[in-house]
């Protein structure tokens, strides 16, 4: 018997022993077909962000972290993702640890608030236990936790003001993520943790910025996205929105360090039409000659506003352009694992 045959026989015996002890499917090969399966995703609601993520959206069965400064658009970005999930017939949950969810604003972004699962927990432990229950149900597609900084440990809430609680929140996050990641992968749920930026004390060289909750989330997150406000959008003297830039600083499902820029309009969120128009020009799908915009040889408007108005009046063209820009045409289903025959 050759060495290869002996190895295969030993592997088959080991697999049979493992499955006898832990159940069928404990050990498996991915198989030839599974290697070619696309990553199942949830659209972010932003064409640019979907493109920057490299797979067309937030990956299912993974942990995602969105962090940034105050009023940079973190919650708005996640509410757009919730609206996308609901539009596709999925179920979404919002763990409002900050107790600051604006229901009327969420409705303006397309969220069906009457169908949204909302929890406003009293402690960090309660928030993460609720999250675990929702994940293990296998019925929730997207869970947003807003925010890590507001996941206050029970010991801190029950203690006196001014008491020192060094590392309690970091230990809480580390324990929770150890329990959650396996269940998240099996259920296909995507969890988005919103996080805040803090400044390290005494840093003389390098970046003094860090995120709350310790290092566990940095390790367990498959995708980490930094969102920053880069400027204001004015209508005359009135500020009507802000410009935002998203940078994918960590990505386990595609090449990292991709960026996306978009306009956040007050009261309506991401300016999708303007984003598709700008990216269409950047990718060559829309031709721009002087102030004129053309699509496949047909002139659609003079000036950005008129071209955007034309796209707004043709939603089917807008949707098709968005899919061409991101390179995706449909939501892939979760790949089925292939078991090893004993």
From Swiss-Prot:
Pfam families: RecA, RecA_C
Any one annotated GO CC term: cytosol
GO MF annotation list: ATP binding; ATP hydrolysis activity; ATP-dependent DNA damage sensor activity; damaged DNA binding; single-stranded DNA binding
Protein purpose: Can catalyze the hydrolysis of ATP in the presence of single-stranded DNA, the ATP-dependent uptake of single-stranded DNA by duplex DNA, and the ATP-dependent hybridization of homologous single-stranded DNAs. It interacts with LexA causing its activation and leading to its autocatalytic cleavage.
PROSITE patterns according to UniProt: RECA_1, RECA_2, RECA_3
InterPro entries (alphabetical): AAA+_ATPase, DNA_recomb/repair_RecA, DNA_recomb/repair_RecA_CS, P-loop_NTPase, RecA-like_C, RecA-like_N, RecA_ATP-bd, RecA_C_sf
Other observations noted: There are two genes for RecA in M.xanthus; recA1 seems less functional than recA2.
Record localization: Cytoplasm
Gene: recA1
Primary subcellular site in the record, as a coarse category: cytoplasm
Disulfide bridge positions per record: none
GO annotation (BP), single: DNA repair
Originating species: Myxococcus xanthus
PANTHER family linked to this entry: MITOCHONDRIAL DNA REPAIR PROTEIN RECA HOMOLOG-RELATED (PTHR45900:SF1), RECA (PTHR45900)
Binding site for ATP: 68-75
SUPFAM superfamilies linked: P-loop containing nucleoside triphosphate hydrolases, RecA protein, C-terminal domain
Keyword annotations from UniProtKB, A to Z: ATP-binding, Cytoplasm, DNA damage, DNA recombination, DNA repair, DNA-binding, Nucleotide-binding, SOS response
Family the UniProt entry places it in: Belongs to the RecA family.
Name under which the protein is recorded: Protein RecA 1
